[in-house]
C-alpha cells in the first residue's frame, strides 16, 4: 500500500508539506524576531506577546497571498504544463491539481487572517489601556510620548476617550483591514460546494472582490501603527539601561527621549510579481475575448444539452483540452469552462453544454434549445472564447493502457479523445505508446446516449475494418429506467444490436462493480502503467482513487494505476 500511495499522492504530499514547512518557518522566525528584537522592546511593553502574533501571521499572509493567484493563472499553468522538459510524470499531474493547491493556500490565508485580526484587537485594547488614568510606570511614560515638541509617538491611541471602533475607522490600516476582512468573508462563504453547485454566478462575482483585497493589502501597512525604535535612537538611547530611568529621559543626556517610526509597507513586495502575472492573464483574456468566434452549427440534444460548433482564427487544440466561454449578452464578466468535444483533425471546435445553472439555462434559451431557435446563425448571440487549456485528460495517449471513466455530461472530454482515435484509425495512423483504451460511461437517462452513440458506432465500425477492434473496449451503464423502458429492453434483448445505443456491445443496467473491473484490467495487463482518467462527481472519484491504490502492485515491475481527475 505505501508504494501504491506514493504513485499517486507522493508529489501532492511533498508540495503540501513544503508549503506547510515554509509557513511554519516564516511564522516562528518572525515571531522570535519581534519577541526579542531590541528596537521593539518598548513596543512590547505596551502590547506584550500580541505584537509577535500579529507580525508573524502578517508575514504568512503575505506569503500565501503571493501564492494564491499562481494556480489560477491558467495561461501560466498551461504554459508550464506544455513544457515537457520541466514538467513530466507526477509533477505534470500535480499541475492538474492546481485548484486543490489554490484551496489549500486559501485555508492558510483564512487561518492567518484570524490570528492577525485577534492579535490586533488585543493590540488596540492594550494601546487604549496605556492611556488609562491608572496607567503608571514605563507603560504610562511610553503612552505619553508624542505630546511634547520634537517627540515621536509610540502609542497611536492619543487619548483615553478614543474608542477601539473610532481608532479602526480613523486609520488607513483600520479601514483597509476592515475591507480585507469583509472581502475574505464574502469570498470564503461563497466558495462552498453548495454555493458553487447551486449558484455558480454568485461564486464567480464574489471571487472578483479579490481586486479590492489586493489593493487594500498593498496599502494596509501605510498607516504604520506598529512602531519601533529608530536605529539612530538605539545608538543614543541604551534600552537596557534607560528603561529603568524613564523619569530622567527629558533631562539625562545618557538617556534622550526615544524616537519611533513605523516600518515601511512590505505586502506589495510579496504580491507584485503574481499580480503582474495575473494582470497579463487578464490582458490575454481581454484580447482573446475580442477575437471573432464564428458559430457554424447549433444542435439541441435531449436532456437539455446544447452542441455548438465554432471556428476561430489560429485556434489549435489537442484532445482532452478545455476552453472558457463568455456570452456578453448574458453576462459581460462571467467565463465558464467547457471541455472540447471535437478532435484536432476537424476544421471546427465544439462543446456540449448541459443546463445546470442560471448562466447555462440562459445560454440554451438564447440559442433556441427550448424550441425557439433563431432561424439564422447570424442572429445568434456573440460568444467569446479563451483557450484552449491543457488538462489531465490530455495525457491519455501517454500511457500504454488508459481507462476513461465518465458520468453523465462528464463524457464530453472523452468525445474529443475517442474522435481523435477514430481519425487516426481512418488515416491508418499509429497511436504511439497507446495499445488499449477502456471506456466506461455511467448515465441515468437513456436519451443522453443519443449524441454519443453515433460516435461510438463510427468508431466501432472503423476499428473493425482496420483490424483494430482490440484497441477499444467500452462499457455503457444505464442507472435509471422506467417500466416502459424495462419492457422494451426485455422484448429486444436477444437482438444482435443494443436496443438503446444500436451498438454491438450491450448496455449494462445498474452500476459497475469497480473491484471486479480493476481486478480484470490488472490481470489483463500485469506489467503495465495504466492511466485512469475520470470526469464526474467527487464521491465516485474517491472510490476510483481507492481502487487505484488497492490494485496497484507494490512490485516495481507489476501493474500500476495512475489516477487523473479533470478539474476546472
Swiss-Prot record:
Q: Which GO terms describe its biological process?
A: defense response; detection of gravity; otolith development; response to gravity; superoxide anion generation; temperature homeostasis
Q: What is its main location?
A: membrane
- Name the domain of life: Eukaryota
Q: Needs which cofactor?
A: heme
Q: What is its EC number?
A: 1.6.3.-
Mark the transmembrane ranges.
Answer: 13-33, 50-70, 104-124, 168-188, 202-222, 396-416
Q: Which SUPFAM superfamilies match?
A: Ferredoxin reductase-like, C-terminal NADP-linked domain, Riboflavin synthase domain-like
Question: Which reaction does this chain catalyze?
Answer: NADPH + 2 O2 = 2 superoxide + NADP(+) + H(+)
Q: Could you tell me one molecular function GO term of this UniProt entry?
A: superoxide-generating NADPH oxidase activity
- Could you state what the record's PTM comment says about this protein? N-glycosylated in a CYBA/p22phox-dependent manner.
Q: How does it assemble?
A: Forms a heterodimer with CYBA/p22phox which is essential for its activity and cell membrane localization.
Full protein name: NADPH oxidase 3
**Organism expressing this protein natively:** Rattus norvegicus (Rat)
Phylogenetic lineage? Eukaryota, Metazoa, Chordata, Craniata, Vertebrata
Identify the gene encoding this protein: Nox3
Amino acid at each position: 500500500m505505501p508504494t501504491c500511495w506514493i504513485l499517486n499522492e507522493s508529489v501532492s504530499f511533498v508540495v503540501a508539506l513544503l508549503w506547510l514547512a515554509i509557513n511554519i518557518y516564516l511564522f516562528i522566525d518572525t515571531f522570535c524576531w519581534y519577541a526579542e528584537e531590541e528596537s521593539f522592546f518598548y513596543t512590547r511593553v505596551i502590547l506584550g506577546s500580541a505584537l509577535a502574533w500579529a507580525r508573524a501571521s502578517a508575514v504568512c499572509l503575505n506569503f500565501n497571498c503571493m501564492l494564491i493567484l499562481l494556480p489560477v493563472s491558467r495561461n501560466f499553468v498551461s504554459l508550464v504544463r506544455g513544457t515537457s522538459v520541466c514538467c513530466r510524470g507526477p509533477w505534470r499531474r500535480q499541475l492538474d491539481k492546481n485548484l486543490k493547491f489554490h484551496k489549500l493556500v486559501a485555508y492558510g490565508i483564512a487561518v492567518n487572517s484570524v490570528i492577525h485580526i485577534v492579535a490586533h484587537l488585543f493590540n488596540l485594547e492594550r494601546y487604549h489601556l496605556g492611556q488609562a488614568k491608572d496607567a503608571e510606570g514605563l507603560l504610562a511614560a511610553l503612552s505619553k510620548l508624542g505630546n511634547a515638541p520634537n517627540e515621536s509617538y509610540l502609542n497611536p491611541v492619543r487619548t483615553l476617550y478614543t474608542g477601539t471602533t473610532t481608532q479602526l475607522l480613523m486609520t488607513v490600516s483600520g479601514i483597509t483591514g476592515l475591507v480585507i476582512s469583509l472581502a475574505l468573508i464574502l469570498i470564503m462563504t461563497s466558495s462552498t460546494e453548495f454555493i458553487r453547485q447551486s449558484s455558480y454566478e454568485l461564486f464567480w462575482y464574489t471571487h472578483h472582490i479579490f481586486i479590492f483585497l489586493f489593493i487594500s493589502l498593498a496599502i494596509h501597512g501605510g498607516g504604520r501603527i506598529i512602531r519601533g525604535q529608530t536605529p539612530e535612537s538605539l545608538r543614543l538611547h541604551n534600552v537596557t539601561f534607560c528603561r529603568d530611568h524613564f523619569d530622567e529621559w527629558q533631562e539625562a543626556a545618557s538617556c534622550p527621549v526615544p524616537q519611533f517610526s513605523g516600518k515601511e509597507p512590505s505586502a506589495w513586495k510579496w504580491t507584485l510579481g503574481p499580480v503582474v502575472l495575473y494582470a497579463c492573464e487578464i490582458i490575454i483574456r481581454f484580447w482573446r475575448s475580442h477575437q471573432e468566434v464564428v458559430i457554424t452549427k447549433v444542435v439541441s440534444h435531449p436532456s437539455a444539452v446544447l452542441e455548438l460548433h465554432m471556428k476561430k482564427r489560429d485556434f489549435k487544440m489537442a484532445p482532452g483540452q478545455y476552453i472558457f466561454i463568455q456570452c456578453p449578452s448574458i453576462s459581460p464578466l462571467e467565463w465558464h469552462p467547457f471541455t472540447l468535444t471535437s478532435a484536432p483533425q476537424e476544421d471546427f471546435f465544439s462543446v456540449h453544454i448541459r443546463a445546470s445553472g442560471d448562466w447555462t439555462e440562459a445560454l440554451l434559451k438564447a440559442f433556441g434549445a427550448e424550441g425557439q431557435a433563431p432561424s439564422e446563425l447570424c442572429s445568434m448571440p456573440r460568444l467569446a472564447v479563451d483557450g484552449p487549456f491543457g488538462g489531465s485528460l490530455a495525457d491519455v495517449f501517454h500511457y500504454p493502457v488508459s481507462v476513461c471513466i465518465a458520468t453523465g455530461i462528464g463524457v464530453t472530454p472523452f468525445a474529443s479523445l475517442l474522435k481523435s482515435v477514430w481519425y487516426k484509425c481512418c488515416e491508418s495512423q499509429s497511436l504511439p505508446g497507446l495499445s488499449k483504451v477502456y471506456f466506461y460511461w455511467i448515465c441515468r437517462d437513456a436519451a443522453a446516449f443519443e449524441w454519443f452513440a453515433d460516435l461510438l458506432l463510427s468508431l466501432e465500425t472503423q476499428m473493425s475494418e482496420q483490424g483494430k477492434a482490440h484497441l477499444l473496449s467500452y462499457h455503457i451503464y444505464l442507472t435509471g429506467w422506467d417500466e416502459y423502458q424495462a419492457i422494451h429492453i426485455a422484448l429486444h434483448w436477444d437482438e444482435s444490436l443494443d436496443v438503446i445505443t444500436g451498438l454491438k456491445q450491450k448496455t449494462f443496467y445498474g452500476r459497475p462493480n469497480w473491484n471486479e473491473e480493476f481486478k480484470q484490467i490488472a490481470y489483463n495487463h500485469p506489467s503495465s502503467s495504466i492511466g485512469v482518467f475520470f470526469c464526474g462527481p467527487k464521491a465516485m472519484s474517491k472510490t476510483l482513487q481507492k481502487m487505484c491504490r488497492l490494485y496497484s502492485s507494490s512490485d516495481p515491475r507489476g501493474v500500476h494505476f495512475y489516477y487523473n481527475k479533470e478539474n476546472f
